[in-house]
Every structure is written in C-alpha cells, then in structure tokens.
Design a protein with these regions (language model features):
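Helix-to-loop junction immediately C-terminal to a conserved catalytic motif
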Residues: 49
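Conserved ABC transporter NBD signature motif
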Residues: 57-65
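Catalytic Walker B motif of ABC-type/P-loop ATPase nucleotide-binding domains
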Residues: 159-162
Length: 216
C-alpha cells in the first residue's frame, strides 16, 4: 500500500527533515508514527499525497512512484486518499453538511449518491444531528470529527492523519482514535502521526518511532 525506500527530504538552507527512511505499510494495516516535534512526522505524511516530493529515494503509494508522478495525475491519486491534517481548512461560512460535501463536489457524483455518502460519513463520526450547524458552533473535538467525515466521504482505501488528537481533552482524543480504529476494522489502511504515547499504547498496533528523520 505504502512503501518508503531510502527516502531523504531536504529543504532549502540544508535542513534535513528525513534521511535514509525505509518502511512499508501493508493493505488494511493501522500504524502509528510517533516522535517529538520536529522528528519528521508531518513531512513523512505530506510525501504520501505528493504535497511534497522526496529529495532522494522512492515513495510508492498504491503502486505509483510519487517522485515520477506528473502534476496532472496528483488529483487522481488523492481521490483514493483520506487526509486529515492539523490545519483542517474547514469552511466557516458553510454548514457542516456543505463542508463534508466538498470533496464530492469536485468528483462528479450524482446528487442523490453524494447526499447519501455525506449523511453516512457524518453518521459514522457522530455529527448527523449537526449537519445544519456552522463549524464555528462545534467544539474542537467535533470540528476534528467533521474533518474526518470530509476525509472519508470519498471512501478512500488509505486514511492518513497528522496529530488528529492535538489540543483535545482526553475523552475527545480517545473518541477520535476510536473512529480511526472503526474505519480500519472495515478494511481501510490507516496511518496516524501522534506524539501521544499513552493513546498509542492502548491499541497494541505497529509503531514507527522517528528520531531526527529516521526510524529509531
């Protein structure tokens, strides 16, 4: 599903975010990426949907080499990915329903099918009763659940999340992770970056711990 082979990522000025990074995530797997702030977790996740490209090495996602992927092909790659980043980019002038609908508006789904998918996604994250609300009316945990609903409305085979429980209380954080576990249980591959070792320890799943851009 996802394979990194001798991947390095360097930024202008010489900052090396990742170095000689190799690992593979199998189809249907749930894995956590842990490490301190600055360890390279966010950079790693951004390479998967080609938000950034590796400086060297290969990143293979669903059989496609990210380094060789043409710019025009990137939107097609991302249609099969669910992305939950720290900057949720929710539209605060639109309803919860409209926010969840956004990915489908770009993919040409028939209106009835799109509406069915949106309601199903909101139901899975416990927001079906809030579909007419504005995101500003939601709690931090509810806003994160809305971001997840938007990420899964296209029924992705791979779901990646960068610090999805950051700034949430313990109860909300646990609920967010349970949502990811539930998607994994129906076959979705899930990759989560987090610094919360306590939450990770509860699940007994594979952990990739990064230190200075490498798997420790």
């Amino acid at each position: 599903m996802v394979s990194f082979s001798s991947v390095a990522k360097r930024y202008p000025g010489g900052q090396e975010a990742l170095r000689d990074l190799s690992f593979a995530i199998g189809e249907g797997e749930l894995a956590f990426i842990t490490g301190r702030s600055g360890a390279g977790k966010s950079t790693l996740l951004k390479l998967i949907p080609a938000i950034e490209r590796p400086t060297s090495g290969s990143v293979i996602v669903k059989g496609q080499n990210i380094s060789a992927l043409k710019r025009a092909a990137i939107p097609y790659l991302r249609r099969n990915l669910g992305l939950v980043f720290q900057d949720q980019k929710l539209l605060y002038d639109r309803s919860v329903y409209d926010n969840a609908m956004l990915p489908l508006a770009f993919s040409g789904h028939a209106p009835k099918e799109a509406a069915r998918r949106v309601r199903a996604a909101l139901d899975k994250v416990g927001l079906l009763g809030r579909e007419r609300s504005n995101p500003i009316q939601l709690s931090g945990g509810e806003q994160q659940r809305l971001a997840i609903a938007r990420a899964v409305v296209n029924r992705p085979s791979l779901l990646i999340a960068d610090e999805p429980t950051a700034n949430l209380d313990a109860e909300s954080a646990a609920r967010i992770l349970e949502i990811f576990v539930a998607f994994n249980q129906v076959g979705v591959t899930v990759l989560i970056a987090t610094h919360d070792q306590g939450l990770v320890a509860r699940y007994g799943k594979r952990v990739l711990h990064l230190e200075k851009g490498r798997v420790a």
